[in-house]
Amino acid sequence: MRKTKSKEFIQKLVDIVGTKNALFGKQETSSFRTGIRIGFGSAIAVVLPRNLIELWEVIKICISQEKIVLMQAANTGLTGGSTPDGDSYDRDLVIINTRYLDKIQLLNKGSQVLAFPGATLYKLEELLEPLNREPHSVIGSSCIGASVVGGVCNNS
């Protein structure tokens, strides 16, 4: 990976999400770069947007600077898709962790849901239980915080 952390790029990320939600050091980004079960690699930054506008702004700046964007929800590491895979990328990689974007909205009396990027299967199960409904998948990883989006992306 190139690791070209320009001060301007870093400052733009901090301006969007604040210093608390823009992480750059190896130690402070370690848990985001390592899956619980599998996966490990490098990233020049980990960004934790707190709303969809911040998410959009972060993605815009990353794309404009030709960074690789790795969207991360629960980072369970069950499939390896939520962490970088080594250090051999041809460009800098930025992890965007969506754990703060965890809203779920029930639509049409619970017949449909709108799940934000960081929403968990556990939370979805809790919301649907009073309606005698179940989520698209009922799997063991619900209890460790697996995301709705991760479940859909991995066909579970």
Task: Outline where the language-model segments fall.
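N-terminal accessory segments
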Residues: 1-37, 65-69, 74
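Short, flexible, solvent-exposed loop/turn segments with mixed acidic/basic and small polar residues
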Residues: 32-38, 101-106
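Short, basic, glycine/proline-bearing loop/turn elements
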Residues: 36-48
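FAD-binding glycine-rich core of flavoenzymes that anchor FAD
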Residues: 52-156
